[in-house]
Structures are given as structure tokens and as C-alpha cells.
Amino acid sequence: MSVVRAEIRVLLDFSKRRGEVSMGWFDEQIKQRRKNDEDIFSDAFADIADAVLGTKRSSSNDGNDEREIGAIWKILEYYKVKPQQLPSSVKTLNDRLEYLLRPNGIMQRNIDLESGWYKDSIGAVLGKRKDDGSAVAFIPKGISGYVYFDDESGKWERINAANEALFEEEAICFYKPFPLGKLTLRSLMRYIVETLSVSDFVFVILSTLAATAVGLLGPKLNNLLMGTVVDSKDYQLLMGITIFMISVSISSLLIRGITSLLMARINTKITISVQAATMMRVLSLPADFFKKYSAGDLSSRAQYIQSLCSMLVSCALNTGLTSIFSLMYITQIFEYAPALVFPALGVILATLLFSLVTTFYQMKYTKKQMELSAEESGMSYSMITGIQKIRLSGAEKRMFARWSKLYAEQLRVAYNPPLFLRANNAFGAIISLSGMIMMYYLAVRSQVGVADYYAFNTAYGMVSGAFMSIASIATTVAQFKPTIEMAKPIMDTIPEIAEGKPVIEQLSGGIEISNVSFRYHDGMPNVIDDLSLKIRPGQYVAIVGSTGCGKSTLLRLLLGFEKPQKGAIYYDGKDLAGIDLKSLRRKIGVVMQNGKLFHGDIFSNIIISAPHLSVDEAWAAAEMAGVADDIRKMPMGMHTMISEGSGGISGGQRQRIMIARAIAPKPKIIMLDEATSALDNITQKIVSDSLDTLKCTRIVIAHRLSTIRECDRIIYLESGKIVEDGTYDELIAQGGKFAELVERQRLDN
């Protein structure tokens, strides 16, 4: 073993010496990339040593809160995610949850545990003990309720009224995500099965089987009543059989009620999980996806995923199980009236066939109605959000005419289908009535007894109901196609979250753009054309150029909103395409050109990217953004409500609140796209001086060139290429494109 260790040590020393070779002109970005390679290289040799020697490296979590990490691992195991070791630099609870849960798409939110919270279970919960503040995982167990691992006893304990007081009221609830790849019917079915517990399936199957077994008594009792009891003229026997039949009816009603409650619980469980997973998937989709659909249209399409899951549950558990078990009633038809079996089955099959033909014929109209409904929802939402613009232009009547045209088409499809579909119910009634007349005739000809006919009629009704349930399954299946097509854009688009992509823990602020080219559509010219740029940590860089030169597009590429067709972008030597984008964006403060505030109070708007920040930290960010005095003058200060359209505040206040939001988490990189266009020179100077104190990398896009005089570098773009690069004074002295742009602005002013 000592020989193996020595050989591995030599290899590691060689790799380090190899990394210490003089790098000449290469800057810090190349050094960082080399360091990343060396870390991976060293880890590979350490893994070989572990495999050969049978040892295990000491955990990087030494000194961390073992209980907290252990609780998070138990939650990961519950969601069938393999736990991984945490870097020593990840120390806070928020950072640990981000590092471990984010790459797997697991969602979380803060909740309050009210009295009796343990009686039902939806997802795993992370809580804390009152005595020592240590973290504890609450894991769903059985048909309802939670269990937790007691470190003292070393056993899993069920939470109940006696021990719920041991835990703090504040906790974090977690939700299971959809698979991170493309969603299919199979993956949705697997998601539903994994969301439900074994007890959910067992209880539903048992209750359905019990309801069917009780139902089998109906034909038997009818035969006994109309035969033996009536022939005997025994009053006591009549009373006894009557009481028994009433008891059977009540039992059947109770069992079906229990089944309905179980199904309602399952549907609620599925609905909560699916809605949370759908929202998380929508929020995780690439930015360019949202260009294709309006907000209302996308909202409607997201709801169809929930509809699809409800259909799957109904087919598999509710209608499906009932239909299968109810087929046992066929044996009773053979028992009481063999001569009527085939005519009865013929009528049932004819009704079933007619129902299926009608359903599949209606599919294309259902799809059309869904599409029109989604389109109408999108237009309605756009009209409501843009009502101020509509009124300013006096276009109320024109907008109503556009909406009513779309709505009328939707009504036309819904209320004026072909004659065959409109007369569907009448045709079905004719088939059923004709079948009953035929069976009455055959019963008379076959001389079926009264008692046997009553029993047959009861069994026939149950068999007919079973086949109609099968028809309803076919109807539901027929609706799968239009429903899937409506939800297909969300299901097919792969989220930005990808399992295995590393979470960004820290940023130094170094950025490298290497030979990047980008166009929005094939066949169009490049907006960014073979652009290369290196930005050192802490640099203050301005990007300028005429309208359409690619400034905002470059910013979108840096944020991962667009993917380059060629080249790569690196942060601290790490390729943007290979890292978790959300964790990167959380380390960057951004104010986009058309940025908006969210509906809510000012405090919520400032801390939205860092919910753990306190009110004092929000005030500090507002001071740096030069908006604190304005907030103090507002009716409720930091808790003043802002409407969706940012009503009640000026454009300058809106921009400064967005700047406060960007700088509140103290990011290492700040990107501003025309973020101070509505500010006067004095306020802009306050903001600029405050940003200087952050000691972070700043990338600014500005049309007002007087605001970038203090920049370390100014990049002039033209047709997606860098044509000039230097300080303000250097570019003015060159007398090139930038100097011409400055001169034009002076003349305009």
C-alpha cells in the first residue's frame, strides 16, 4: 500500500509542477481555468487511491452542522436523489439547500406549522427542534402523517399530539419536481406513481373490490325476493329480506362514499404536487421560450398538464378499477337468463361502439376549442394589462371588436357542431330503448321467470354501467391527444436546470467571451459576430454603440438568456453552458432596459432575489441606490404597495428600486442596461459613487455617454463586432467612432 501511495503522490506532485509552468501573458481567467482542471485532475487520482486502498477521504463537511446536513440528506433520499458531499465553503442553510436541491429541481417554500399539521402529509418538511435549534427532517409515512428520526433513540418516530410541541412553528416544505428532461405520458405516469404511497393504491383497490362484492348481492336478493319470498307468502321472511336489502344498500353507499373520499384525497395530493411542479417547470424554461406565447396562452397551456394528470388518475384508479371489477356481473347474467346474454351484450356493445365513434369524431372539435380558448385567454390578459395604452389611444371599440371576433369563433365551435354531435344524446337513447324492447320480446318468447328476469335486469344494469365506464375511459383517452398537444410546448421544452451541472458557490467577477457569434433566426445576419472580450474582476466596463449594434443582445448572452451558435462564455474559467444558470444569476445584479417591479411592497421587491435579507439590509440597499429618502416619504415606508403597472411611483424611483434590488445581495458582478436613463445627473452621481464602494465587476450599457466618463474601459460595438476599446480619454483622442458619437450627442444637447 505504501508503494501505491508513493506512486500516486509522485503523480500528484507532477501534476502540480506541470500547473506551475510560467504562463507568460495569460491573465487570471486562464489561471482560474487551469486551477479548475487541476482540481478535477487531483480528485481523479484521489479516487484511484480510495479504490485501491479501500479508504475514504475525510468529508469536507467536518465542522459543519452534521444534523442539518443529515436532515437534508434524508429529504434527498425521500425524493430518490443521491446525496453528495458539500464543499467546506457552503456553510449557511440557504446555501446548502441551493447547492444540494437546485441541480435536481426540488422546490421549497417557507411554511408555518399550525396545530395538528402532522395529520396529513403532502411533501417532505425541514423543521427545527425548540430545545437546541437542530434541524430535523419530517418524512411522509403511510396513508397520512409524518415521521422523524430521533437521534437519541436511533429510531424513526411518528409525529403526534404528544411530540408536535417539540418543534418550531417555522419550517421549509419541499415539492417533488417533474423529470428534468422531456415530459412524456410515461414519465407523467411514473411521477404520479412516485407521488402516491403504496397505502393509497391498496386502500382504493380494497374499497373498490368491496363495493363490487356488495353489488353482487343485488341480483341474488332480487331473485330471492321475487321467487322464494313471494311464493312462500311469509311476512316475516319478507321483512327479514327487506331489512337485509336496506342494509346492503346502506353498506354499498358507505363503501362508495369511502372510495370517493379516498379518490378525492389522491386527486388533492396529485393536484398540489403537479401544480407546484408545473409552475417550477415553467419558471425554469429558457428565456427564449416565452417569446413564442402570450402570458394568458401560456397560463392555459400550463393548466392542461394538471388536466392530463387528472385524466390518468381517473383512468387508472377510479373508472378503470370500477370497470374491471364490475365485469364480474356478467357471470350473473349467464346464471339467470342464458337466452338473453348475447342480445344483452349486443345492445351494450352497440351502445359502446356508438359512444366511441362519437368521441373520436369530436376530438378535432375539442382540440379546436382548446386552441381558441387559450388564444382568447391570451388576448384577454393582454387587454387587461394594456388597458392604459388602449384608453390613451382611444382604441376601446377596436380592441373589443378584435376580442369579440375571436370569442364568436370560439362560441361557434362550442355551440354549433355537426348535426351528428348535436343529436348524440338522442341517438344513444334510441339505441338503449330499442335494446330494451328487444329484450322484453326475447324474455317473453324464452319464457324467462319473473324472479330470474328481475335478477337479470339488475345484473344487466350493472354490466351496462361497467361497459359505459369503459366507454368513458375511451372518451378520456380520446381527449389525451388534444390535451397533450396543448401542453406539448411546456412538456417538450427542456428546462435550464440540468442534473449534474455544478452550482456556482462564489464568483470573483472575471468574464471571458471567446469567439462568440449569435443570430436570432437562421438566415439572418449575425447580431454578435465572432466577438472576443476579457473582463478582469473589479473592472468597470461600458458597452456603447449605435442602435441595433448588439449591446442588449450581448447582455442577454452573458446572462444565458440566449445561446451562441459559436464560441463560449466563461465565468472564472467555467463555461456558461456547463454550469447551473440560476445559481450564476443569483450572484449577478441585473437591471434590464425594460425591467419592471413586481406587484407587492417595496421591501419584497428589493429582497426578491435574496429572501433571507432583513429590513435593515433592504434599507442599506435603498440608501446606496439613492431612493431611501423617497421611500421614507411614502405612506407605509418600505412596506408601501406597488401595483403591477408600477403606479404611484415615478420612472426614476422605479429605476432606483430596481438598482437597490440588484445590489442588495452584494453581487460580484453588476450589469446595467440603460438603468439610469430616468435619473438626473445628481442622483446618477450618488448611485455611481455607491456602486464604486461595492468593489465588483460592472458592465454598463449606456446611450448617455456623459455617464461613462469614469469607466475603466469603453467597448464600442458596430454590427456585433468590437471596433474600439479603451478609456474615455483614449477613445476621444483617437477621434474614431466613439468620438463621433460623443460629438453628435453634444450637438443634439
Feature annotation, model-predicted:
Residues 230-247, 329-349, 416-486, 490-491:
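Helix-loop-helix
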